[in-house]
Regions:
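Surface-exposed, charged secondary-structure patches
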Residues: 56-96
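Surface-exposed loop/turn and secondary-structure junction residues enriched for glycine/proline
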Residues: 7, 38-39, 65-68, 73, ...
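Short flexible coil/turn linkers enriched for glycine and charged/polar residues
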Residues: 26, 38, 74-80, 112, ...
């Protein structure tokens, strides 16, 4: 897409990263439904449902986004697809129903590498991108 502005895309991608992470942690399915493809939404919703059924709570603190960069961009017909690599610092804690830590450490900041793929139909008047894939490096 000749109108693609990488700098403003990355500004929006950083905001989306924070909003999606926050909505996932709080279990806000409505926010997620508007930002994610159906497949990604179904995966996120399933993880939230499982967490809630188990009586677990998650605390995810995004300390900082150290870097965001476009690592791949392509066109499939009128669909622009952009994969972004995020380097962030996060604190991740999963607690059981009694508040006991069952995963993570509330006092440990972890370096996290995520690859998020966004897509949008460039022939559409809608300027918003949708998150269509996620993966993390562990």
């Amino acid at each position: 897409d000749k109108n693609f502005d990488e700098e403003s895309f990355l500004v929006g991608a950083r905001v989306a990263f924070e909003v999606v992470l926050g909505a996932y942690v709080s279990g806000d399915r409505e926010v997620l439904k508007n930002l994610l493809s159906q497949e990604v939404y179904d995966n996120f919703r399933s993880a939230i449902d499982d967490r809630e059924k188990a009586g677990h709570s998650i605390e995810e603190t995004l300390v900082s986004i150290q870097a965001a960069e476009v690592v791949e961009a392509s066109m499939e017909g009128s669909r622009a697809i952009v994969t972004t690599k995020f380097l962030s610092e996060q604190v991740h804690v999963l607690r059981d129903g009694q508040g006991e830590v069952i995963d993570g450490n509330p006092n440990e900041i972890m370096d996290v590498v995520d690859f998020w793929t966004f897509a949008r139909d460039v022939s559409s008047q809608d300027p918003n991108w949708q998150l269509v894939a996620t993966r993390s490096l562990d």
